[in-house]
Amino acid sequence: MSHNLEGKKAIVAEVSSQVAKAQAIVIAEYRGLGVDQFTRLRVKARESGIYFRVIKNTFARRAVADTPFSGLAESMVGPLAYGIGSDPVATAKILHEFAKDNDRFVIKAGAMAGIVMSDKDVAALAVLPSREELLSKLLGTMQAPIAKFVRTLNEVPSKFVRGLAAVRDKK
């Protein structure tokens, strides 16, 4: 019995450490999904840096107790898979896209730092651009005036050189 208890404590400790680093948790109900489908989802999740696992709900409740995600405990009923990630948009996006392709995988709820989200909120979060996309758009917006100014400064000597080349070609 103690070995079994130690194994259970290890699972709760592992999930608790992931929850401590997390910015978002998405829980989904999976009824009748095949192993191959789950394997594809696990691979996608791992590539995106998402901790994805199927565990007993009592273990998950203990892992989120006394954390900003403790409000999810009421939604932890039935056969659930847990996606835990440091990027809320990526976590929601990976699981939402998988749910669109598989009708037996249904997003049930989610949470971000004290905010419990419904399945519709998770879907809305999933359609947002990722952090990298937003940063690249911001950087492009910030660089545009500078780049335009540099091109304008460069145009004066370029016009002069083109004028000299035209005079040279004329002679």
From Swiss-Prot:
GO terms for molecular function: large ribosomal subunit rRNA binding. SUPFAM superfamilies: Ribosomal protein L10-like. Keywords: Ribonucleoprotein, Ribosomal protein, RNA-binding, rRNA-binding. One of its GO terms (cellular component) is ribosome. GO terms for biological process: translation. InterPro entries: Ribosomal_uL10, Ribosomal_uL10-like_sf, Ribosomal_uL10_bac, Ribosomal_uL10_bac_type. Pfam families: Ribosomal_L10. It comes from the Bacteria. Part of the ribosomal stalk of the 50S ribosomal subunit. The N-terminus interacts with L11 and the large rRNA to form the base of the stalk. The C-terminus forms an elongated spine to which L12 dimers bind in a sequential fashion forming a multimeric L10(L12)X complex. Belongs to the universal ribosomal protein uL10 family. NCBIfam families: PRK00099.1-1. Forms part of the ribosomal stalk, playing a central role in the interaction of the ribosome with GTP-bound translation factors. This is Large ribosomal subunit protein uL10. It comes from Nitrosomonas europaea (strain ATCC 19718 / CIP 103999 / KCTC 2705 / NBRC 14298). The gene is rplJ.
